[in-house]
Each structure stands twice: as structure tokens, then as C-alpha cells.
């Protein structure tokens, strides 16, 4: 199976080559440089996906081939940066005592953004100009919001806050202090799931406060990305098996609605996870179409790299032929002592710059307010 040339180009240019990081019994770990020194440094490694909590970190790698060794792995493949694959030996139905700390809410008045309204609207116009020239059909343009956070706050406590205030179907969290990984995800979007040989993706395109506010532009945008996802899955699935089984489903989420479509296929024989990721990453809904042209525009317009935001986040269990990877949207992470959160919008020729800015505000408003609250397990 040949990976998509677009995905291969992206993985080569945005994921820096590095020797495998491996941690196993009796072996030292080669550290990935921590971007958040001191943050949560006394906490033990831990993961949560759904109602299961991962403990007892057994292996740590940045090579996707590691998951073929078996076990259940937490997976973080950032939009920009080094991937992390972490195998936890124990998965339990409740958090262990004293393994979740506290979250001291961030100051609501000190959020900063990588693009203010004027800059963002100018980026929308630049993208529309590229569309008018036929260079691209759709591009997802994002900005990163940042805020200072207490160095002894625990991302798992923020995850608990998100679970209470923003229940999401593909939520999860990962804390590995020794390599600076602190991520809490409340994603409504499925990048990939696997059950046996079946591979499923559920791209989101189209966002509004209410269903009646959805526009024809939202529907057109969704259909464009469905075609892109069908093409991606066809690179790792049996010929003729890839199909859209649900189109333009309206889903209600806290504070907004989304248009969601479902695409599925049957994985070809001898195709492993490295082939699947190479064929489909990054997710089409947060890149654009055609993907390589959209990624070039993103690189030229976004002043801050996305890091984990818009990447893949979830788990893979090769032994049971199952997996669930979210598109890492509605996701908080810690970088250099700052809490970060990305928000964006899909730009088409029919986009209004002011309305696209407001969409980024809508997506950020509810979750930002949750991060401004405090939480303590006791």
C-alpha cells in the first residue's frame, strides 16, 4: 500500500527525525525535551479515555511501529512535533486514590491569541484569494489562545472539569511529566476508529449556535471534506469498500451544533498502523482540500504552530484490533508554563471574514470558561 504523497510530505517536513524513545523493564529512557519544566513534575504518568484510567507506564516511544508489540497504547500524534506512544500496563475503571491533583482556574482577563480579529480576518481574505485562483477549495485557519497557569496545577484535574462541564464522545487526557506531556481533550470529532478490519472516520464540518443557523456553505464544506476522507481511506482500505454511510447529520454539543458525516472502509490485508496514519494524517477536516495545498497555506498564514492541536489523540490496542483516535480539537495542553487552546474555522469562497472570526469565538467560549474554574478532588 502506497501512502498518500500529501501525507508523506507532511510527515517528513513537520515531524523531526529522532531515534526511538524506548522505556521498558531494566532500560533507561531517552528523554524527549520537556516543553513544560516543572509543571506537574511530581505526578505519576496517567491516561484517561472514556471511563478507563491507564496506570503503570511500561513503554514510551515516538515510533508508531512500537504499537505492534502489543498492549494498549495511549497515542498523541501532534499536528506539529514529535508523536508519543505510551503503553500503560494497567487499565482500571476508576482513578486511583491521590493520583489526580487540583486545578487552579486561569485568569479570564489574561487570555492572549496568536491572531487578533484583524489578523484573522486578513488571513480569511488571503485564503479566499487563493481559492479564487483555483489553488485550493477549502482551508482550516486556526489561532492559538494562551494563558498562564499555576505550575502545580494538574491537567488531569482540568480533564475532570471538562468531563463535568463539556461531556464529549472522544474525550481523554494524558499526563507524562518526564517528557512534558500534559493534554486534556474534549473532542467531539472522530479521526479514526477500528473494530476488526473496519476503519471509520466521522469528519465535522459546519458549526453554528443552532441547527437553523447552519448555512449552505456549511453543507458544501462538509461534502468537500467527505470526498477528501474517502480518498484518504481508499489508500489503506480494500477497493470498493470505502463509502459514506451517513451524510450531514446534525449533532448537538454544549453551546453549538455540528454537521457530521461518517465514512468507513475495510482495511486491506497486511496494512499496519504506520500505513494507515501515513495515508490519512493529518485529518482532512482540520487541513483542507486539496490537502497539500491547504497545508502550505496554513504554514504561511498561522504565526504559531499548532502543536498537539488538530493532531490525533486516543488509543490503539493491536491485540484486540481496536482503536479510537480523536481529532485533537477542543483540546488544552501545557507548553512552557502556558495553558494553550486552539480554535479555528473552515474557509471557503463563501466565507465571511467576520463570521469566521465569530465561529472561532463560539468554539472557544464555553471551554475557556471551564478552564477558568477551579477543581479539587477532595
Model-found features: residue ranges?
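Extended alpha-helical targeting/anchoring segments
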Residues: 11, 16-378
